[in-house]
From Swiss-Prot:
Hexamer. GO terms for biological process: alcohol biosynthetic process; mycotoxin biosynthetic process; terpenoid biosynthetic process. This is Cyclopiane-type diterpene synthase. Residues 371-397 are annotated as: Disordered. The lineage of its organism: Eukaryota, Fungi, Dikarya, Ascomycota, Pezizomycotina. The gene is PcCS.
Length: 770
């Protein structure tokens, strides 16, 4: 079986690079990717994207002129279509690691990782104004680029991978306070701290290897041994640099390295400890080979597991040969980054870019066109745009509402709803558009504040008008503060928003009145349809959405444009309108879907009543749009399906206006009807079409903006996408490495150390004699 594992893209590297080097004693032969130039290109591109062309080579990551690119060596069978993204991500991880290593204290470290979380997840963001510096803007764009591309190539793995990245950085500890009684304790920590599993999972996905949970469990002991070996080799070669940094800082930079741990726990000199670590590396490689041989001898070993083990061998050998002479650890005669840029130029290295390819296939486009609805053109729903005339606003700004004694009662509902968790879509949009418009900080704060007031005002009124019970899993504001007080707060917030917008250019006020008019007209039509149980056509519904939901998105774009210092002629109103459509229809779709209600497997609808009750009380409530009698997009499509009678559905909707919550059985019946009529499938087809149009329009807009790629907007679109296929996501690799450590050495250890390795014993004797 092992002989059938082929190296499709990997080629052996010249033995002269490592064979005669006494520092290389790995049991495995190193390979490199045939298209390693791609990894080199994107490594330089990452530097340009992050810090500009003048800063290329100021720090070191993947590139190694002696042996080759780190990603090319460790993942030499990476699929070509994933290779650039994997290498770019690894390069960024190297640079981010340098940033966190250089953080002045734990607070600075947490701040650095918090910014990464916000960019990847586009939630929990701090004020947009904190991200207007060129450095912060560049970093945010790079992080968004990485996230958007993973979600584009593989939404299921992308979501898992980004969540794993956030979890890892959120758990980073201040190592100054950590103590390790033994090397085993250290390795259990180090595998997580060095993100070994995260990095290798990235390589695994890049290589097209997929393990089932059962296969993952079988491979875990071998994976642990390989991860530990990678960490030990890293510590061995980085020791001199880390020790010098520790001495130079008078001990402020901690020594978190296997060499130091061995020296302290075993009472050895650093020189002797290095010999012990070298022996540990060999012991781990030998143990890996033993475990692999045992697995290969089992009945029907998995082909995918064997591919994974082959990748681990490549990574161990690649990491070792890369470490022999790399700028991250030792001085080199020439800077490989500057040399590469000088040789190929800045245009050639721009491999990871959306402008040279579409993000969907021709077959996908055909499917979407076949299923698409006849939607109104952008001119069907007229908005009232006025000429944009940027003028400086007044000096005084009221960016937040100061809570005086007189204002506090009015602000209580606002304070409450503003404290609830949010998806931050509008704040994300503001930050993304600023990549193009470069709005001054003061104007940016005004826009952010006004949009926050308007959004919360809309939520307060929506909950009253819809008869909602929950908002983001919490009681709605009017149940706490009363309907009258909540309405008063909502109208007060509209006035406060106008007060702020008047500080901007005159065209900003026109944009406010235009879009607030559109928003109220759209909301009015929605309320009318729900109250009278009138079923509009899909085109009428989309026209309503263009006002109700698209209005605030267009207002953001128009306010940003009115204050722009760059690209002031860039009109993205059409994009904002399409974004509003996608956002609302997706919200309609998801409201009628849940973990227990997925299509086409309607059987999951009939879960035990206890499970349904649990789902019912979760978040906003199970299918609460049905309770509110809302004629949402899937409902409209279902009631326009030929060959079906709408009498029963219409009767249920009329009954729901009495203010009574529908029973679970009634909701099950309605969902079954909507599903049987193909409305959910048709809604997904419309969402895919909108997704396609948004990406296409984004690329057109990027060209109009001088080729400035907007990865934050692209990530926002990707996160709004509906994943159609249920793939097997890789298991969450938050397993206890201590358990895998014991499984890996079972039957061959004493006090945690191998006892059947002569090389280990010899090294110990030599170390103790020095």
């Amino acid at each position: 079986m092992a002989d059938k594992i082929t190296d499709e893209y990997a080629v052996g590297i010249d033995p002269e690079i490592y064979a005669n080097n006494p520092a290389y004693s790995s049991l495995f032969n190193p390979y490199i990717h045939k298209q390693t130039i791609i990894a080199d290109h994107v490594s330089v591109q990452c530097h340009i994207d992050l810090n500009g062309i003048d800063a290329v080579g100021s720090k070191f990551g993947n590139l190694n002129a002696h042996a080759g690119n780190f990603t090319s060596l460790c993942a030499p069978n990476c699929l070509p279509e994933r290779f650039a993204l994997v290498a770019y991500t690894v390069e960024y991880a190297f640079l981010h690691d340098d940033e966190t290593d250089n953080a002045a204290d734990q607070e600075a470290l947490l701040l650095e990782n918090k910014m990464l979380h916000q960019a990847l997840n586009q939630s929990g963001m701090t004020s947009v104004s904190t991200r207007v510096s060129d450095k912060a803007q560049r970093k945010s764009e790079v992080q968004a680029k990485i996230a958007a591309e993973y979600l584009r190539l593989d939404p299921v793995f992308g979501e898992w991978f980004l969540n794993k990245w956030q979890t890892f950085t959120a758990c980073v500890k201040d190592v100054r306070s950590l103590e390790f009684p033994s090397l085993d304790d250290y390795l259990e920590f180090r595998i997580v701290d060095a993100a070994a599993d995260w990095t290798l999972y990235n390589f695994r996905w890049g290589s097209g290897i997929t393990l089932t949970p059962e296969e993952e469990k079988l491979a875990d002991p071998m994976s642990y041994v390989a991860y530990a070996e990678l960490c030990l080799v890293n510590d061995l070669f980085s020791w001199d640099k880390e020790y010098a940094s520790h001495i130079k800082s008078n001990g402020d930079v901690p020594l978190v390295n296997a060499v130091h741990i061995v020296a302290v726990t075993q009472g050895l000199t650093h020189c002797a400890a290095k010999a012990v670590v070298q022996a540990e590396v060999r012991a781990h490689e030998e143990r890996f080979c033993q475990l692999k041989e045992q697995y290969e001898a089992t009945d029907k070993p998995s082909h995918e597991v064997l591919r994974w083990l082959r990748l681990l061998e490549h990574s161990m050998a690649g990491n070792w040969v890369w470490s022999l002479c790399v700028p991250r650890y030792c001085k080199v005669d020439r800077n490989p980054y500057k040399d590469h840029l000088e040789k190929y130029g800045s245009d050639a290295v721009r491999v990871l870019t959306p402008l040279d390819r579409l993000c969907w296939s021709k077959q996908e486009i055909k499917e979407m066109k076949r299923n698409q609805l006849k939607e109104p053109s952008s001119s069907t729903y007229k908005t009232h745009f006025s000429p944009l005339e940027p003028n400086p606003g007044p000096e005084q700004t009221r960016l937040t509402i100061s809570q005086t004694q007189q204002q506090r009662p009015v602000l209580n509902p606002y304070t409450y709803i503003n404290s609830l968790p949010s998806k931050n879509v509008r704040q994300t949009l503001i930050a993304a558009l600023n990549s193009w418009y470069k709005v001054p900080v003061k104007s940016l704060l005004i826009i952010e504040g006004a949009v926050n007031f308007l959004h919360n005002s809309s939520l307060l009124l929506d909950d009253i008008q819809d008869g909602s019970v929950l908002r983001r899993g919490r009681p709605v504001a009017h149940q706490i503060f009363g309907v009258g007080q909540t309405i008063n707060t909502a109208t007060y917030l509209m006035n406060e928003a106008l007060y702020l917008i008047q500080m901007l250019s005159p065209s900003a006020v026109s944009a406010y009145t235009d879009e607030m008019r559109n928003l109220q007209l759209g909301q009015g039509r929605d309320l009318y349809w729900s109250y009278h149980t009138h079923v509009p056509t899909p085109a009428q519904y989309i026209s309503m959405v263009d006002g109700k939901t698209g209005g605030l998105f267009r207002l953001i774009s128009r306010l940003m444009r009115s204050e722009a210092t760059k690209n002031s002629d860039l009109d993205i109103s059409q994009f904002a309108t399409l974004l509003g459509r996608h956002f609302q229809i997706r919200d309609d779709y998801q409201n009628l879907q849940s973990e227990d209600v997925t299509n086409p497997h309607i059987v999951s609808l009939y879960a035990p009543r206890a499970n349904m009750l649990l789902q019912y009380t979760k978040n906003k409530g199970f299918c609460d749009d049905l309770d509110e009698g809302k004629v949402s997009f899937p409902v409209i499509l279902s009631m326009q399906s030929p060959g079906f009678s709408n009498t029963a559905l219409s009767s249920v909707f009329k009954g729901s206006r009495k203010g009574e919550t529908l029973s679970l059985e009634m909701k099950q019946y309605m969902l079954e009807e909507i599903t049987a009529r193909g409305a959910f499938s048709e809604t997904k087809a419309v969402l895919r079409k909108l997704h396609t149009e948004l990406l296409s329009l984004l690329m057109e807009t990027e060209k109009k903006a001088g080729g400035v790629e907007n990865w934050a907007l692209r990530l926002l679109i990707m996160k709004l996408d509906i994943v159609e296929e249920k793939k097997v996501a890789p298991p969450k690799s938050d397993s206890h490495w201590g358990v895998n450590q014991r499984r890996a050495w079972k039957g061959g250890q004493k006090n945690g150390r191998p006892i059947d390795k002569a090389c280990f014993l010899r090294a110990m004797e030599e170390a103790l004699q020095k």
